[in-house]
């Protein structure tokens, strides 16, 4: 959408697109920035929540470098990381240790007294890594199930974008024109090439989010240190009192 970050996937004009003959795959996605932590390393990532039919849209399984691309095995959710993200975190596919994803609480305010309540977190295991040979994907993307992304970012039926795979005989530019006429001025329609330019702006937003999250985590650390310091002082007073009493 041109205004705001999300669209409602249950809106009639959106649902109609899935029925068009030119559309082979209709895929709602959520893209939001988050902080990814693995052991003592951390970096900002672009979390992309996708539905089960994502492999029909992207054929991402063809660019997997390690592990097997899967986002859910019926019991556990998984994440697939760009090879650059995985390398900087030092994590490999099928690691017994999960990565942690943290994002600001979209519906709440920053709570400086208890910063942990200011963001949502998820622990999730890495099923695979992929290499698209494009830095905008390899160095920032973390793909998770759409349902998990909606929980993490407090969405229900919303999506930040709808990605489409067209039939082989469909002209991309002509279809984009038809789509703009159908949706009107309320939505942004972009071809694959135009989408790459948009990702450059996402990179800037990603680092801003990283700085904000780092600041919140730093405050949380200082709060813990302060609380421990006060506890030590109180305990020392108790020890001194007991010693004075001859204990």
Where are these regions (language model features)?
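Hydrophobic, regular-secondary-structure patches
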Residues: 1-46, 52, 56, 62-75
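Structural motif
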Residues: 18-24, 89, 187, 206
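A generic structural signal for short hydrophobic patches within well-formed alpha-helices
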Residues: 55, 85-86, 149
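A residue-level structural signature of the nucleotidyltransferase/glycosyltransferase Rossmann-like core
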Residues: 77-78, 141
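Short, solvent-exposed hinge/capping segments at secondary-structure junctions
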Residues: 81-96
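Basic-flanked hydrophobic alpha-helices used for secretion and membrane insertion
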Residues: 94-186
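Peri-transmembrane interface segments
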Residues: 134, 168-225, 231-234
């Amino acid at each position: 959408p041109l205004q705001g970050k999300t669209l409602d996937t249950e809106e009639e004009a959106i649902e109609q697109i899935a029925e068009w003959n030119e559309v082979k795959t209709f895929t709602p996605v959520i893209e939001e920035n988050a902080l990814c932590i693995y052991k003592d390393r951390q970096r900002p990532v672009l979390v992309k929540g996708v539905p089960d039919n994502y492999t029909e849209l992207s054929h991402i399984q063809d660019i997997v470098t390690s592990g097997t691309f899967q986002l859910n095995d019926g019991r556990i959710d998984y994440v697939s990381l760009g090879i650059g993200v995985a390398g900087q975190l030092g994590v490999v596919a099928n690691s017994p240790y999960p990565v942690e994803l943290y994002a600001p609480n979209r519906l709440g305010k920053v709570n400086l007294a208890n910063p942990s309540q200011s963001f949502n977190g998820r622990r999730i295991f890495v099923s695979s890594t992929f290499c698209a040979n494009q830095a905008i994907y390899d160095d920032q993307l973390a793909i998770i199930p759409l349902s998990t992304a909606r929980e993490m970012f407090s969405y229900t039926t919303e999506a930040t974008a709808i990605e489409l795979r067209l039939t082989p005989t469909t002209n991309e530019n002509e279809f984009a024109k038809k789509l703009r006429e159908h949706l009107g001025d309320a939505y942004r329609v972009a071809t694959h090439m135009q989408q790459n330019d948009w990702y450059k702006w996402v990179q800037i937003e990603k680092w801003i989010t990283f700085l904000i999250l780092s600041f919140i985590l730093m405050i949380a650390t200082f709060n813990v240190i302060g609380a421990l310091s006060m506890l030590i002082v109180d305990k020392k007073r108790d020890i001194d009192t007991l010693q004075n009493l001859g204990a």
